Every structure is written in C-alpha cells, then in structure tokens.
C-alpha cells in the first residue's frame, strides 16, 4: 500500500481558461475517487506552457518529501522512451538546433520536433499532447536531480480535445462542450459518478458551471486598458505575439481577439494563456519555482502525509493566515492567487454566490 498524492491546477487551467468547477470541489472528488492528498499547483505554473506547468508540478511534488514515484498518463505509456526523449531535449546541442529550425518560420511545436529528431529517433512522440507533458515531467526530474522516478502509463479513451461522446472515456473537452451547449444531462452521464455529484452540489450553490464568457466584458476591458508595453511584458521570448494581441485588443469579443491574433506560430492555447495572464495580473517568469505547498483536500492517509510534510522543503499552508509569516515573495504570490480566486468567483452563474475573500476563509477539505 502507498499514499497517493496529486497536484492539481486551481481555478484556472493550462489551456488558458476558467475551470468549469472550482478547485476544492474537484479536489474533494479526486480524494473520493482514490487520491489521499491533493495539492494545488500555484497559479503562475497552472496557466503556463507545458514546460513550466510540468516543472511547477514536479517541483511541488519533489519538495513535499513524501513522493517516490511520479505517475502520469501519456499516449505511448512508455517511461523509457519518454525519459530518453527528455534527455535529448536537455542535450547541450539542442538549443542551437531549435533556433535553426525556428528560422524556417513554423510553429514552435513543429520546430522543436524537427530539432529533437536530429538527436532522437523517438521525436514523433512530441506529436501527442500528453506525451509532450510526460517528456516535460521527465525533463523536470532530470533538471532538479530528483530521486523521484517517473512512471508513465497509457491513456485510455478519447484523444485529447476530442469531442466524441460515444467512447467509454470521453475527453474533458467533450464534457465541457456539452455543458456549453446546454446538454447538462448528457454531460453528467459522461462524468464519473463522484464528479457528477460534485457538479450538482456546486450547481445548486450557484457556483457551476463556470465559463470564461461570464467575465468576457471584464477581460475585454482589461485588454483595452493595457498599453503596448503591458502586452510586451507578457511576451517573454520577445517574438512579437504581444504586439499581435495589442493590435487585436479592440475586437468586440474574445473569440474575435484570438482569431485576429493567431498565426501558425502563435497557437490559440498560447494566446488564451496570455489573455488570462493579462486579466489576472500574472507576469511570466516572476517566480522561478513554487514557494509553498497548499493542500486542497485530504483523507485520513492524506492527513498522515501532511504530518510527515512538516519537514518538507517548502512551507505547507493549511491555513491562509500562515502566509503572513513567510517572506515577501511568498506573500506576493499568495496575494496574486487570492485576487485570481476573487475574479474566478465573478464568473459564477449566481453572482450572489461570488463573495470575495474566500481564499482567506476556506481551508482544505478533510474527508
């Protein structure tokens, strides 16, 4: 027997969007489904590129001091292949090869795959999104010199982003699509029973489903109030994507902003994340790594793990007030996360449920 520790995005997610259901309800559902402890991936890493998303998650789990294996799903399910490709991407020759391929003018993903193919026979694995994340998890473990060992297992069911609802395990995209289309009953049938119950409870409380459209005018207002320099600050690579968003900021809907700004080199997911950074006040690269661990839900075994985490490399915040004893950088990160939670609440279907300050009142769900 072993404890199962999960790390999970909070109210905003890596695809550059609002989570349909709030983080504590999802974390509690995860514990009811077999996890023992769920930790929150702090906001700057939850809404980052695959590389930074993976690094934040791996850093948090490694810093907990209670994790020996890092298990994750991928399309190929072969740990050795994914880890070998991670080693190729960390090869000292790779950055120069990538720059050479980027000059062709293709997307970053295509250029990276071609550069990787010059060092590894398995570069085609980078065509699949969960293989990409798996490679990034392995890369992060190698970068950190961690003793945690990776363990890939094959994904089952629909492919990432598939809208096919006829499979036994449909994608989350399919469920979100049905909810957006008002097909609630069909969406609930596709959810795991525990998650369906959590959704119904949040729905009854006026807190679900949450969609970006609930805050669309506020997001557009934020974009229109930003200067060209503000947009440039979101573009770490200085590739011009910030300027494209600045030029598109006056469009009357977020879909129109995205449609005008996107190119082959700047995919929609990246643009959605940048818009979310603008709305929430996230500055990419402001923090090198997570600064604290924050549990969202736990059962009895999870509470025992939390007791062992008193000697973790990062402070564990079971109460929000504990952050006041941490350094200024940690307090600034927590302040960013509390503001983001307040903005998320404004997208609730029932505005009366969107009282600000919940992050200071709510602790982990103990089951």
Task: Give, region by region, the residue ranges found by the protein language model.
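N-terminal catalytic cores of NTP/NDP-binding nucleotidyl/phosphoryl-transfer enzymes
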Residues: 1-26
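Generic alpha-helical scaffold signal
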Residues: 20-24, 32, 48-55
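Short low-complexity stretches enriched in small and charged residues
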Residues: 25-29, 106-108
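Active-site cores that bind ATP or allylic diphosphates and position pyrophosphate for catalysis
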Residues: 41-367
């Amino acid at each position: 027997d072993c404890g199962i520790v999960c790390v999970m995005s909070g109210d905003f997610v890596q695809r550059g969007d609002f989570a349909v259901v709030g983080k504590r309800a999802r974390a509690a559902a995860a514990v009811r489904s077999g996890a023992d402890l769920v930790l929150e991936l702090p906001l700057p890493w939850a809404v980052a590129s695959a590389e930074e998303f993976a690094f934040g998650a791996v850093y948090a789990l490694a810093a907990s001091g209670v994790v020996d294996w890092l298990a994750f799903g991928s399309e190929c399910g072969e740990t050795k292949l994914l880890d070998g490709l991670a080693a190729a991407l960390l090869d000292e020759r790779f950055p120069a090869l990538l720059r050479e391929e980027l000059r062709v003018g293709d997307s970053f993903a295509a250029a990276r795959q071609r550069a990787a193919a010059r060092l590894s026979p398995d570069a085609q694995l980078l065509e699949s999104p969960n293989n990409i994340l798996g490679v990034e998890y392995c890369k992060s473990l190698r970068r950190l010199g961690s003793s945690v060992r990776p363990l890939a297992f094959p994904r089952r069911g629909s492919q990432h982003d598939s809208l096919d609802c006829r499979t036994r395990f449909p994608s989350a995209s399919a469920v979100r699509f049905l909810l957006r289309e008002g097909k609630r009953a069909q969406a609930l049938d596709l959810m795991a029973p525990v998650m369906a119950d959590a959704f119904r409870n949040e729905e009854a409380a006026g807190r679900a489903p949450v969609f970006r459209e609930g805050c669309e005018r506020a997001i557009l207002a934020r974009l229109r109030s930003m200067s060209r320099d503000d947009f440039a600050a979101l573009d770490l690579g200085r590739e011009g994507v910030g300027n494209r968003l600045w030029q598109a900021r006056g469009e009357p809907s977020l879909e129109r902003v995205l449609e005008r700004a996107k190119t082959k080199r700047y995919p929609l997911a990246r643009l959605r994340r940048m818009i979310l950074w603008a709305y929430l006040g996230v500055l990419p690269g402001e923090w090198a790594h997570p600064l604290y661990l924050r549990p969202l839900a736990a059962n009895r075994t999870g509470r025992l793990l939390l007791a062992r985490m008193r000697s973790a490399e990062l402070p564990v915040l079971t109460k929000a007030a504990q952050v006041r004893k941490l350094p200024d950088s940690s307090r600034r990160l927590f302040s960013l996360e509390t503001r983001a939670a307040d903005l998320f609440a404004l997208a609730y279907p029932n505005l009366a449920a969107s009282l600000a300050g919940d992050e200071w009142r709510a602790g982990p769900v103990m089951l």
